[in-house]
Amino acid sequence: MKTEKPKKLIRWCILGAVGCGFMAVGDWLLGCIPLRETDTGLFNRAYYLSGSYGLWKPVLTVGLGAVGGFLYYFVVKALNADIDTKYRKTKIIQYLCGIFTVAVALTIHTWVATMAWFTTYLGPRIGEEAAIAAVTAYQDGMLLAIAPMYVPMILAFGIHFVMLLAGKTRYSRWMLAFHPVTWNLLLAAVPDIAQAMQMPVATWMSVMSQSSTNSAIMVWCIAAAVYERSHTQ
């Protein structure tokens, strides 16, 4: 089942990988900091609270996210084109969820970046406890709107995963090894496993966990582009 020209799909995958790269770099800017055993969550981190973190980094993260979010559209097009045209309703649902995911990705990216900015700015000025209380209130307030946004994102990638598993896409089932769902679970789980094994807290844990989703999608885009190229020669 091949409904799209391979060259077009390769182009979409490459543009999507670049977009994920921009988003992942933003994640790395937020997560690449010295960690302490007492650090928890996305913003309760000693390095932020001390004011040592550069305030320009969250700003750059949002800028990179805007470019990455735009290029995410090509990820959506590529994923949707993979699904067999016989499943028209499934393709429509997956596509609409994918389009919404583009907006969700930038929204969440900005939300996390602003928490880092507020924590860094407020920590040295009003004290660590007051800063944590203020940013926690901001996080909890925004979470009411943010949490439901994960549903279409999960559906966009979950539907594609199920269709690939069922053999209803243009790819062989072994491509599940490179699927965003597979790699997202892997990248998110490794730091937790390392901590369960009582390994010292390290920067790589934060970076891997924080960038897991964007890195996972980038892995898929690269793998899909390579697959298409190898099957058109």
Each language-model region and where it sits:
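Hydrophobic, aromatic-enriched alpha-helical segments typical of multi-pass transmembrane helices
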Residues: K2-Q233
